[in-house]
Amino acid sequence: MKSVLYSVLASFVLASALYVPARAAGLNIETATIADLNAALASGTLTSETLVSAYLKRIEAYDKKGPAINAIITLNKKALDEARQLDVERKNGHVRGPLHGIPVVLKDNYDTVDMPTTAGSQLLEGHMAKQDAFMVKKLREAGAIVLGKVNLSEFAGSGGSVSGATDPAIIKAGSVPNGASSAGGQTKNPHELLHGPAGSSGGTGAAIAAAFAQFGLGTDTGGSVRGPSSANGIVGLKPTHGLLSRAGIVPLALSFDTGGPMARSVYDVAVALGVMTGVDPADDATKKSEGKFERDYTKYLKTGALKGARVGIARDFMGKDAGTDVIVEAAIATLKKLGAAVVDPIKYPDYILQSKGALYNIVTYAEFKAQIADYLKTSEPQFPKTLDEIVARANDPKTGYRSPEKAVALKYTASVALDLTDPSYIAAKNEALVSTKAAVMALFEKYRLDAILYPTSPRPAQYIKPDGLPAPTDSPTNLANESGFPAWSGLPVTISFFGRAFSEGQLLGYGYDFEQATKASVLPKYTPALPSDVIGMTVAGKNP
């Protein structure tokens, strides 16, 4: 039986003329872009204090009450004070940029000096970082207001982190729904409460869909920005590995890890991305971006961007769900109408498709074991310092771990994680990953492609209740991480564009063109508009 969420999100592009949510006669924070907000702030019809208050009212109404989306782990108690200070700056003629006074939420694996960083684990509750993550620092310098920190799949491990397990008992005991953590509990999808928000950035996805902030930050190791963006009907960008610094982000696997912006519009993603780029001495990977990053990606947002673009269709990732395929076919037809040169189909090498899951697991498990210890070594004495210590505490009955399934999953991770000196890990990192990247590049060259299109997920979003089955291994999202190339998702038809390294501007342009042509979006039915959502005017819209 198909889920309600699938019908709401995936079918909407084909039936967009049938229903349009009521809109306010004025500026509505659910639908306003950062450009809209800046115009209102500049005119004096809006203040950052009013904007922050409006978002806080939505959080108050919908996060722990009503539908109880449960996306927020920690709220910034000083958010209103910061907004007032930024309003004073604006009044005195100092505007830092387009994010001046704009609220953002952070996945709770980004370090912040003023709020704990838990990575979703109760073992890290109260853990305070000594400085902001690089990306957070850049946002704050640009005037963004960190409204709070949001839930995630614990330690950014989507699902139960038992990928690769073959023992049915381990799979069943260690299966955790995406968007659940021992620190934050279970986050719900605001479109359909029986479904999860996907992972691991499920809290960010749900919070942005529910309009708890203007934009948010997620992290992506194998699809963790794109999956939640798709499941929650928003826009997400997984940038090229090295475009954004990971300094101050709790690591999962630095060979793949990257931060990424998530928002309700392509424009907002583009604005946020440009603010956060730059070479960071604390993250050697960012050296790859020198001379390639931009400060303003909005210049690429033009209608007509898809005209003449060569877009390959990766049918290797279709055929898993008939309804999803119908939506992808409709998206392909739209691309053709917009003038794209569609290359259909393109074919990934079989060995890449067959080995990508195992390759991802070898690298991720080994690096998490080593890198979480490196991250925790400077934490206060009361916190665990190694993966083995995390496993011991999580599985100790005295701890009262609130996610016994995650305790099993962590134990499994520790049991299979290789050392970084293990020949199998070294071969995977230095040979197999290099081969994967070369194979993907060869695909772009063979078909002379500007981008590859595929369904972000081959199936609809999962129910919250785990079914005891292993996570699907046929998702294409981890290929973007294994190659290091950028991918962005969140179109109303849950598709992803996958591009060459440092082609973010081009991909955002494609997404913007598609977004403007289809205007296919839907607001979550469980978090409807509040009177305070409308700036200066009352809600007066009607369904056509």
Predicted segments, located by residue:
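Structural helix-boundary/capping segments
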Residues: 61, 141, 209-315, 329-336, ...
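Short glycine/serine-rich loop/turn segments
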Residues: 99-259, 284-287, 312-314, 452-469, ...
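Gly/Ser-rich, acidic/histidine-flanked active-site/gating loops
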Residues: 30, 110, 116, 256-258, ...
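Short, well-ordered alpha-helical
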Residues: 25-126, 152-159, 288-289, 297, ...
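Sec/Tat signal peptide C-region and signal peptidase I cleavage site
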Residues: 18-24
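Glycine-rich, small-residue loops and helix-cap segments
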Residues: 44, 101, 141, 213, ...
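Bacterial N-terminal signal peptides
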Residues: 7-17
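Short helix-loop capping/hinge segments that flank enzyme active sites or metal/cofactor-binding pockets
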Residues: 100-119, 300-312, 363-436, 441, ...
